[in-house]
Amino acid sequence: MSKYIAGPEIERLIQILARLPGLGPRSARRAALHLIKKKETLLEPLGAAVQAAIEKVGICSVCGNVDTIDPCSICTDSRRDDTTIIVVEDIADLWALERAKTLAARYHVLGGRLSPLDGIGPDELNIATLIQRVVQNPITEIILAVNATVEGQTTAHYITDQLSNFPVKITRLAHGVPVGGELDYLDDGTLAAAVQARTNL
């Protein structure tokens, strides 16, 4: 009896797809079969897009966003407010706020949130680089757009404490962000209201 149902290459494709968020083994099998059936219109363009991403996409050295240029297109956009930095946990949160089109400011991606139980401390996050940006630039406001989770709020308080000696206003998102909620799952209107109703810490 064969080790593989449909060949090792297909099994490998299924295993890789199953690692994606929201895809379990069954969904990965369905996705793999769909890609194979649509080889010319889906599988080949997907392969080309993945290869292009491998070759051209990188992390912005200023804010931590992903882009094909460094600094990224947000950091090089002269129409944005240079005095305000929106701090987010992950790139998905940055994208969610950009979709809401509420504030043309700069961003800073932490790369996660403080979680001692998971071994994630300040040194594992981009907090030192945030402080460096505040020191080197005329920043007047830091908006802490972290998720309304225990870890997110712990991260917000830690950053507030680290910036307490700087002449910078620190605010956070308010109305519309439910406790325990994550930014990437909120609709654009809710996010817009949250940004406009931000409060002091």
From Swiss-Prot:
Protein family: Belongs to the RecR family.
What does the function comment of this entry state? May play a role in DNA repair. It seems to be involved in an RecBC-independent recombinational process of DNA repair. It may act with RecF and RecO.
Please give one Pfam family short name. Answer: Toprim_4
Using the record's annotation, list all stretches that form the Toprim domain. 83-178
Phylogenetic placement of the source organism: Bacteria, Pseudomonadati, Pseudomonadota, Alphaproteobacteria, Hyphomicrobiales
Source organism per UniProt: Bartonella tribocorum (strain CIP 105476 / IBS 506)
The molecular function terms of the Gene Ontology recorded here are: DNA binding; zinc ion binding
Identify the InterPro entries for this entry: DNA_Rcmb_RecR, Rcmb_RecR, Rcmb_RecR_Znf, TOPRIM_dom, TOPRIM_RecR
Q: Which GO terms describe its biological process?
A: DNA recombination; DNA repair
Keywords of the record, alphabetical order, are: DNA damage, DNA recombination, DNA repair, Metal-binding, Zinc, Zinc-finger
Lineage: superkingdom: Bacteria
Instruction: Report the stretches of sequence that form zinc fingers (C4-type).
Output: 60-75
Q: Does the keyword Membrane apply?
A: no
What is the official name of this protein in its record?
Answer: Recombination protein RecR
Q: List the disulfide bonds.
A: none
